[in-house]
From Swiss-Prot:
Reaction(s) this enzyme catalyzes, per UniProt: RNA(n) + a ribonucleoside 5'-triphosphate = RNA(n+1) + diphosphate
Cited NCBIfam families: PRK00398.1-3
GO terms for biological process, alphabetical: DNA-templated transcription
Disulfide bonds: none
Subunit: Part of the RNA polymerase complex.
Keyword Transcription: yes
Cofactor(s) the protein needs: Zn(2+)
A GO cellular component annotation in the UniProt record: cytoplasm
Subcellular location: Cytoplasm
Name of the protein in question: DNA-directed RNA polymerase subunit Rpo12
Binding-site residues, Zn(2+): 8, 23, 26
Lineage summary: Archaea, Methanobacteriati, Methanobacteriota, Stenosarchaea group, Methanomicrobia
Family stated for the protein in its record: Belongs to the archaeal Rpo12/eukaryotic RPC10 RNA polymerase subunit family.
Keywords per UniProt: Cytoplasm, DNA-directed RNA polymerase, Metal-binding, Nucleotidyltransferase, Transcription, Transferase, Zinc
Length: 45
């Protein structure tokens, strides 16, 4: 699953086997889950 680093804004793939979650580029620990590019449309009631 792809995440985006809050500091350097790069896309990061997280390895869940590794104990900690960090950006490999800047070392920042806050990662945001990227939203899909598709738009969901719902019919109004």
């Amino acid at each position: 699953m792809a995440y985006k680093c809050a500091r350097c804004k790069r896309t990061v793939e997280v390895d869940y086997e590794y104990a900690g979650v960090r950006c490999p580029y800047c070392g920042h620990r806050i990662l945001m889950k990227e939203r899909p590019t598709t738009v969901k449309r719902m019919k109004a009631i």
